[in-house]
Curated annotation (Swiss-Prot):
It catalyses: N(6)-[(R)-lipoyl]-L-lysyl-[glycine-cleavage complex H protein] + glycine + H(+) = N(6)-[(R)-S(8)-aminomethyldihydrolipoyl]-L-lysyl-[glycine-cleavage complex H protein] + CO2. It comes from Carboxydothermus hydrogenoformans (strain ATCC BAA-161 / DSM 6008 / Z-2901). The keyword Repeat does not apply. The glycine cleavage system catalyzes the degradation of glycine. The P protein binds the alpha-amino group of glycine through its pyridoxal phosphate cofactor; CO(2) is released and the remaining methylamine moiety is then transferred to the lipoamide cofactor of the H protein. The keyword Thylakoid does not apply. GO terms for molecular function: glycine dehydrogenase (decarboxylating) activity. This is Probable glycine dehydrogenase (decarboxylating) subunit 1. One of its GO terms (biological process) is nucleoside metabolic process.
Length: 444
């Protein structure tokens, strides 16, 4: 290999320092049956033109949202991304996910993060926001750890209507610290309030809620807030940022921490990533917040400047005592969210939310009119679930008509199968929705 950096002498020196005599001895823990005992037989090299054609042919095997009508839900949504978003992202000054440690050389990036934080605070109604998390699941898990640290309690309740993948991440994060995670069952598509009240006690650090929940249903968040705060625990809410164009901000119903996935804010579907997680909280929780915080200050000459602040919380300062181990964050994705929100504005976000709501309800009413039965009958935002005969057959039939819907509910809640999730955004037209209904019409 032409660019392997180690010389034979360096390899011998490294092996000697380890008390080894050969590369084979170094890798002796690898079973013989899985070792390749023949040449790798890689194809010969290609020119740049050939590589581009080869990659284009590989990419052409995949479908894209441009070639299909997308009704996919379960956490990733086909919202419109204004052209200006990607135009700004591709500027070389911004094109990195790394944290701008040198404030004197990074004022533009730091200001963009500060603007992002300001917008998320406006959306959620809370006091402080960090520079971003990896995604919605990691943001919710970090919120659980933060609640445990703040309350000095070791039990967290998570509603069974929270995205199953988010719940899985929470369980992974809390396994090491031995935090007890208890799932609260659902009833008719939202939390069973009686069971929740039974489970909340003086050892409960927080209740983790998703609103709208995984099924698209609106949770009774004000009642949940009352129950957890009566025991001096924290309310953690995972929200769809688009829904905040028309729903109450989390602060208004007493959320102490609000998190969510920012994919819908100017980030494409991209086969499930990369995303960003947003994380907002009350001001008094600032020193327990994970991730980076950008603050506004003045330099010695009185000029405005942006800096990373409260850094004593972070892993590059306190290592094992840090509030989290997040390092390189999702700054580029957060910039996309910033440009998106600045572009659509408050009125635009409200219009996007309203159109998503109205079009989802139009699709719902059309399907019910065709004889489909809803899995749940409560109020929903832009996503709902209908019962079907066979999930796989339905999704394959839709695929043949270049329609993507789902996933089937059996993937996450086998006890509710067979049923199909359908999400509708502002991008969908009446004709596209009518076509969906027409294709589904004979498969009730």
């Amino acid at each position: 290999m032409k660019y392997t950096p180690h010389t034979p002498d360096e390899v011998r020196e490294m092996l000697s320092s380890l008390g080894l005599s050969s590369i084979e001895e170094l890798f002796s823990d690898i079973p013989e049956e899985v070792k390749l005992k023949r040449p790798l037989n890689l194809p010969s090299g290609m020119s740049e033109l050939e590589v581009k054609k080869h990659l284009a042919n590989l990419a052409a095997k995949n479908g894209s949202a441009d070639k299909y009508t997308v009704f996919l839900g379960a956490g990733v949504y086909d919202h419109y991304v204004p052209a200006v978003v990607n135009h700004i992202l591709l500027r070389s000054e911004f094109y990195t996910a790394y944290t701008p440690y040198q404030a004197e050389m990074s004022q533009g990036v730091l200001q963009s993060i500060f603007e992002y934080q300001t917008m998320i605070c406006e959306l959620t109604g809370l006091d402080i926001t960090n520079a971003s998390m990896y995604d919605g699941g990691s943001a919710l898990a970090e919120a659980a750890l933060m609640a445990v640290s703040q309350t000095r309690r070791d039990k967290v309740l998570v509603l069974a209507t929270v995205h199953p993948e988010y719940r899985s991440v929470v369980k992974t994060y809390t396994w090491g610290p031995e935090i007890e995670v208890v799932e609260v069952p659902y009833k008719s598509g939202t939390v069973d309030l009686e069971k929740l009240e039974e489970l909340i006690d003086d050892k409960t650090a927080a209740v983790l809620v998703q609103h709208p929940n995984f099924f698209g249903q609106l949770e009774p968040v004000e009642e949940i807030s009352r129950l957890i705060h009566a025991q001096k625990g924290l309310l953690v809410v995972a929200v769809d940022p688009i829904s905040l164009g028309i729903l109450k901000p989390p602060a208004e119903y007493g959320a102490d921490i609000a998190v969510g996935d920012g994919q819908a804010l100017g980030n494409g579907l991209a086969f499930g990533g990369p995303h960003l997680g947003f994380f907002a909280a009350r001001k008094d929780l600032a020193r327990r917040m994970p991730g980076r915080l950008v603050g506004l200050t003045t330099d010695k000459e009185g000029n405005r400047g942006f800096v990373l602040t409260l850094q004593a919380r972070e892993q590059h300062i306190r290592r094992e005592k840090a509030t989290s181990n997040i390092c390189s964050n999702q700054a580029l994705n957060a910039l996309a969210a910033t440009v998106y929100l600045a572009t659509v504005g408050k009125k635009g976000l409200k219009e996007i939310a309203l159109q998503s709501l109205q079009k989802a309800h139009y699709a719902f009413e059309r399907l019910i009119g065709e004889g489909y039965e809803p899995l749940f009958s409560g109020p929903f935002f832009k996503e709902f679930v209908v019962k079907v005969k066979n999930e796989e057959e339905i999704t394959q039939k839709l695929l043949k008509h270049h329609i993507l819907a789902g996933p089937g509910i059996s993937r996450f809640y086998p006890e509710l199968a067979p049923a199909l999730m359908i999400a509708v955004t502002e991008k969908r037209t009446r004709e596209e929705i009518d076509n969906l209904v027409e294709v589904l019409g004979g498969d009730r």
